[in-house]
């Protein structure tokens, strides 16, 4: 599972193959579900960086209050699940991140860990949906509310030490293939499975302050390592 992650201006510098020519990313060291976050998508052959609410709202929902609005989609079912099938086929995206948090249950409570790739950042695979706001006119630029889910897979090596699921991340050579429309379902799933499995070996994690437990706390100090007593 991926339920909290980090994005910062440094992410732009660490993902040049993905974010070159796009606006700088904001600093948010405690991104939580329902937040409108930057995502990379491709339209008319060009990459752009819109914001999408974290938690997929299908286009057929009557309003934004209807649940569920899943924050994660499983790689095993994303291409066949009724909620994700169309977004996977038509609206794939990449969610840039400096890293993400996972929690380990200890005798003294839940201990957050920051999972990241040293000297790099993560290009997490996602799917998007556009929900038509019935209160807006068709020509209103705010008519369509974008939302997204992050695709996850079974975790192994370092990420598997803190949770049994992890975000499915893409390698730079696969960005165009993932965002484009020239590959079929089987090829896309194979690409994502291969990349995410290999990239997991580059990830590491360390315990961080329990201040990260509250979404009201933010700032770069949240990802600094702490010594557990």
Segments from the language model and where they lie:
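Short linear sequence motif anchored by a di-proline
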Residues: 1-229
């Amino acid at each position: 599972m991926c339920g909290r992650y980090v994005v910062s201006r440094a992410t732009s510098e660490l993902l040049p193959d993905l974010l070159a020519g796009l606006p700088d990313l904001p600093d948010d060291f405690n991104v939580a579900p329902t937040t409108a976050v930057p995502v990379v998508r491709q339209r008319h052959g060009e990459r752009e960086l819109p914001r999408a609410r974290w938690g997929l709202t299908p286009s057929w929902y009557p309003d934004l209050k209807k649940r569920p609005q899943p924050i994660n989609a499983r790689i095993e079912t994303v291409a066949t699940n009724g909620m994700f099938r169309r977004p996977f086929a038509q609206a794939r995206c990449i969610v840039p991140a400096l890293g993400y948090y996972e929690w380990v249950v200890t005798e003294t409570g839940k201990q957050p860990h920051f999972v990241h790739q040293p000297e790099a950042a993560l290009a997490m695979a996602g799917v998007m949906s556009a929900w038509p706001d019935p209160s807006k006119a068709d020509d209103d630029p705010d008519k369509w509310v974008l939302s997204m889910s992050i695709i996850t897979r079974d975790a192994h090596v370092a990420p598997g030490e803190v949770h049994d699921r992890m975000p499915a991340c893409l390698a730079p050579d696969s960005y165009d293939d993932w965002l484009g429309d020239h590959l079929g379902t089987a090829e896309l799933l194979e690409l994502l499975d291969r990349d995410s499995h290999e990239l997991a070996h580059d990830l590491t994690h360390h315990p961080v302050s329990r201040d990260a437990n509250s979404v009201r706390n933010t700032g770069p100090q949240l990802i600094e390592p702490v010594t557990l007593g």
